Amino acid sequence: MYGRIDSSSDFHYTQSASKQMDAETQEFADTFARMHLDRSNGGSSSAARYTLDHEPPVVPIDLETFRREIRKFHGKEITDIANNPQEYSDFVSAKARRTADVAQQYGIRRDSENARYFSYQLGNQCVGLMRTEGGFSMEEEFESKSWRDQFPGHQEITSTVDLQVAHPLVENAGDILLEHQLRRDGERPLLNWRAENPEAKARAAMMGFVEVDDCDMVLDPKQHPDKWTQTSAAEWRRKDKPPLYLRKFEDAETAQCSTSCSYETYEDDFM
């Protein structure tokens, strides 16, 4: 395993929450404009529109699409951000360097037949990628036996986040991909993650992951009600986050992805 990491429809809004989401929508739109997401395929100069939707724009993709997209995460756009801290800030440029390193080192390898691939799509651009592998027996895989006390009642990891990268200008892409995987794993997920750098470990710990073996971190969201909650449909989502997700307006209308992908019926940047 190479886990390399660089809702309910019953929504109740207050006026302040609505204003918060409006502000976030505008902030995201400004960010995406910097990423050239506002360029239409036909070259029109009309401004792109964004909307908030109850379904995250995360879609399954095939291996070929994943490999094509992962190359972009160590391509010119990301390396330009990494090399220009005066324009993007030291923090964002450092994040871009980590993203490029992870994508280049671990993006393409021989995957197992259980590997699955997901893209976080905004308009016609992929702003986050995730590769997952199946679960396993903790007794058989972990050298340490601390998991017995850390996760009483559990014997099996439900899935492994094998790799995740997110565009350095999209702050929540990684978190939303993680949320999506927890939802796929059902009501009692136990998610394995391998963090390969100190920043990844620190961020994972903030989201509730605990270290079991060296670099192996595991999340049981039920142990962290301050960080994770479930909707009335028993779907996992981040605590105290707006229950809506940003989409380009065209995405919300057509629910289509420009890359080779198909939708399935299952219902702040992680790394």
UniProtKB/Swiss-Prot annotation:
PTM comment: Phosphorylated.
GO cellular component term of the entry, any: extracellular region
Source organism superkingdom: Bacteria
Locations listed in the record: Secreted
Major site of localization recorded for this protein: secreted
UniProtKB keywords: Nodulation, Phosphoprotein, Plasmid, Secreted
This protein's record includes keyword Phosphoprotein: yes
Similarity annotation: Belongs to the NopP family.
Protein name per UniProt: Effector protein NopP
Organism: Sinorhizobium fredii (strain NBRC 101917 / NGR234)
